[in-house]
């Protein structure tokens, strides 16, 4: 039985992490599956993971970006500097531990789930190992981000995109490389037994309620739309740092 390794930043709450767990649960039916995880944020994956999937934690460190920014905001310079140095050491450990895993694993297939992993996998992955990048984000006209993805994945065998439009976009960008782009949509854990009739005038958004997700922008946009279409409602489902702000 062939072995698949999936490189993961952590197994906490997040869309990428949910997709990683769903993929691992599917692949373990036919492969040995190991998730190589940089950070151990919780005692176990927050999403239900098949017992056949092995999780290997590469470090004992945890990210400290939040603490660093909090001290900066409060102008506690010494503590911010201390957290900054701690963060730099953490980035060094993260890079070295991930590269060591890539070079030493006996896996036949390695799947990267972040652009930083894409680059390291392309540079340090062993000959004969199938190297796959899995891009979850849309570049949203940010060509710096898109070009970074192209640079990071140019030495991989495949780049998996979650939409047809992204597949077409990156296929053109990677045309002069050996990296082939393929479209594979995200996995559904379970197919719903009952389908929506789609007759209600409701807008529904589900996700982590954090600043980068743009829920305040969504709410502002809905306030404009609702003036012209007052019978439509907006349901925001989720939890996170901006929940209280959204509720108020």
Task: Indicate residue ranges for each PLM-predicted region.
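Membrane-proximal helix-turn-helix segments that form the acceptor-binding/catalytic region
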Residues: 95-104, 138-161
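A short, histidine- and acid-enriched strand-loop-helix "catalytic/donor-clamping" loop
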Residues: 116-120, 128-145
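N-terminal strand-loop element at the rim of the active site
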Residues: 6-13, 26, 30-85, 180-181
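Short His-centered aromatic/hydrophobic patch
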Residues: 91-94, 112-117
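Donor nucleotide-sugar binding/catalytic pocket of nucleotide-sugar-dependent glycosyltransferases
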Residues: 133-140, 154-192
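A conserved mid-protein helix/loop that constitutes part of the nucleotide-sugar donor-binding site
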Residues: 17-22, 201, 205-224, 241-244
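Glycosyltransferase donor-sugar binding loop
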Residues: 35-43, 206, 233-246
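Short hydrophobic "strand-cap" motifs at the C-terminus of beta-strands
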Residues: 7-8, 162, 203-207, 237
């Amino acid at each position: 039985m062939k072995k698949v390794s999936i490189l993961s930043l952590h197994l906490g709450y997040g869309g990428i992490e949910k997709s990683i767990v769903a993929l691992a649960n599917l692949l373990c039916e036919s492969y040995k599956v190991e998730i190589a995880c940089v950070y151990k944020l919780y005692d176990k994956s927050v999403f239900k993971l098949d017992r056949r999937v092995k999780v290997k934690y590469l470090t004992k460190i945890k990210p400290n970006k939040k603490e660093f920014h909090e001290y900066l905001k409060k102008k506690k310079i010494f503590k911010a500097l201390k957290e900054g140095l701690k963060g730099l050491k953490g980035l060094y450990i993260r890079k070295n531990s991930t590269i060591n895993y890539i070079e030493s694993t006996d896996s036949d297939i390695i799947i990267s789930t972040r652009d930083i992993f894409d680059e390291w996998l392309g540079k340090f992955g062993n000959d004969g190992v199938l190297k796959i990048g899995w891009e979850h984000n849309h570049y949203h006209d940010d060509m710096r981000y898109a070009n970074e993805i192209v640079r990071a994945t140019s030495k991989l065998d495949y780049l998996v995109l979650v939409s047809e439009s992204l597949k077409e976009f990156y296929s053109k960008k990677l045309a002069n490389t050996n990296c082939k782009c393929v479209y594979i949509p995200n996995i559904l854990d379970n197919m719903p037994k009952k389908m929506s009739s789609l007759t209600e005038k409701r807008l529904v958004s589900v996700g982590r309620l954090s600043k980068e997700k743009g829920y305040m922008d969504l709410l502002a946009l809905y306030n404009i739309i609702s003036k012209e279409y007052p019978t439509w409602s907006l349901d925001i489902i989720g939890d996170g740092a901006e929940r209280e702000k959204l509720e108020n």
